């Protein structure tokens, strides 16, 4: 079994961005082709870069945690992402940002460091059975997502500290420069285009205002939900960055195939086996229904194999409605394979009576004659 990205970097699933970066820098230096002659260095270096490329990005990491390693890779390959080919980042580029943190250099990411960013929406696939879809149900689901930091309450700033307005751009996030007839606008170099500055980032969330954890959530599945229904839970998605609004959670419903019923909109179809005696003579038969229990169905005398009998308002419930669909029973007349002596005698008598009736009315011979005329 191949290693997942956390195992490749040697960190836990709850590792912070600082821990990820530290692990990446250590491994990148160890396996970079410019620093070692080991045979498998290039392969390991590619794997390390692929892992860090995903986990350093909050949205990619959330998708990776949600889908799992194999499913995420398949999705990336279909979308054309995640293929680094033979490209090797320069060793100086890898450690440039690392050294600038200590030296106050200008090698800084252009990614916003203080701006509020809305959290990503999440998708959860939930499978239920047909009875649960009929009655409706409360389901507890478990998933990993970014949650608002409970230490800084999403601000990204250390407790007691405030997020200050950038004095270089007055909170605009950009500066303007006049060159002749042209005005050039560029991102503020001091706040990186955000308009605000976090002087002391929160230690728990490293200034992001959120961190990843496993969540348990109770979701309500309404009665009459159909296969493929998407239910939106506002604000239950990824927490926003630095106080940004949370995304939404979308629960996609899949209904498992049923052993007895087939669903057609709000109607239910089922195969109903009956004896040839009941088919001929008619009668009452007990039929199971989706809400539980049984109801009586009248079988008309002379019912044929393949006939369809309807039980009104015994189908599926409809969302936000008191109306129900129907249940349609498809008759399957069963012919006995093993007859007792008495049963055979009775059928022989029935056979003779049937032949005599057809001979008397001439219908049988007329039909045969017409076949040869």
Curated annotation (Swiss-Prot):
GO terms for molecular function: ATP binding; heat shock protein binding; unfolded protein binding; zinc ion binding. GO terms for biological process: chaperone cofactor-dependent protein refolding; DNA replication; protein refolding; response to heat. Its cofactor is Zn(2+). The keyword Cytoplasm applies. CDD domains: DnaJ, DnaJ_C, DnaJ_zf. It is found in: Cytoplasm. Participates actively in the response to hyperosmotic and heat shock by preventing the aggregation of stress-denatured proteins and by disaggregating proteins, also in an autonomous, DnaK-independent fashion. Unfolded proteins bind initially to DnaJ; upon interaction with the DnaJ-bound protein, DnaK hydrolyzes its bound ATP, resulting in the formation of a stable complex. GrpE releases ADP from DnaK; ATP binding to DnaK triggers the release of the substrate protein, thus completing the reaction cycle. Belongs to the DnaJ family. This is Chaperone protein DnaJ. It comes from Rickettsia rickettsii (strain Iowa). The lineage of its organism: Bacteria, Pseudomonadati, Pseudomonadota, Alphaproteobacteria, Rickettsiales.
